[in-house]
């Protein structure tokens, strides 16, 4: 239970919960890593057509991330004790905010799930977080994390890696922007994706290739996967 300490008219101090203490330790560890971030703008026209009942834009992003990560294991990796471990299994963590703080439940084996399967699993773990019923197994084993603040109206941001993971993807809001398409100015639903990486585990070229693969999938696929 969260405790409150009365400090008079200036306000109150709140002791950190166990979950918050763990997050503080993880974020402190993250700041010891040499991090870099790269950003790409993606046209979400095709991605928006893949939404359906029970399938959100976040689900589409998670599904295409899983496919791109399977092709680029240098991003689907951990760094620990001067060792880089690249994974064939794609276990995507999704940052979820609740009254209890920030939790990162994991969709295990995401590379083997359909879009509908990812949507169902995402809905399940988010509901468990919001209800305070998340289990230890639900937050263990992540190989990559996605943080989406687009629904909060945040255009672009840089996320901090979730150690020992090698990278984290920050997704901003999808908004209409004027872009040039084959020489013509057009209004398109654009979204900024920022990838933060641990330079000890990967490099800018590998990060750019992953984002290019993700961009290609989101911009060209118009059918559920």
Predicted regions and their residues:
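C-terminal catalytic/motor cores of large multi-domain enzyme assemblies
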Residues: 1-225
């Amino acid at each position: 239970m969260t405790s409150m300490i009365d400090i008079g008219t200036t306000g109150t101090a709140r002791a950190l919960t166990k979950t918050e203490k763990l997050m503080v330790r993880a974020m402190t560890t993250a700041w010891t890593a040499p991090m870099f971030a790269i950003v790409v703008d993606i046209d979400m026209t095709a991605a928006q057509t893949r939404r359906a009942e029970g399938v959100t834009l976040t689900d589409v992003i998670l599904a295409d991330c899983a496919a791109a990560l399977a092709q680029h294991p240098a991003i689907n990796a951990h760094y620990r004790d001067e060792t880089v471990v690249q994974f064939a299994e794609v276990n995507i963590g999704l940052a979820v905010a609740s009254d209890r703080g920030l939790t990162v439940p994991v969709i295990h084996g995401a590379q083997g799930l359909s879009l509908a399967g990812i949507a169902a699993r995402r809905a399940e773990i988010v509901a468990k977080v919001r209800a305070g019923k998340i289990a230890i197994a639900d937050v263990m084993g992540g190989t990559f994390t996605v943080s989406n603040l687009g629904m909060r109206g945040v255009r672009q941001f840089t996320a901090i890696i979730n150690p020992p993971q090698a990278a984290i993807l920050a997704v901003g809001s999808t908004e209409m922007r004027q872009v040039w398409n084959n020489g013509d100015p057009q209004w398109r639903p654009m979204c900024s994706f920022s990838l933060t990486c641990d330079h000890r585990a990967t490099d800018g070229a590998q990060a750019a290739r992953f984002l290019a693969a993700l961009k290609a999938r989101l911009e060209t696929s118009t059918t559920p996967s």
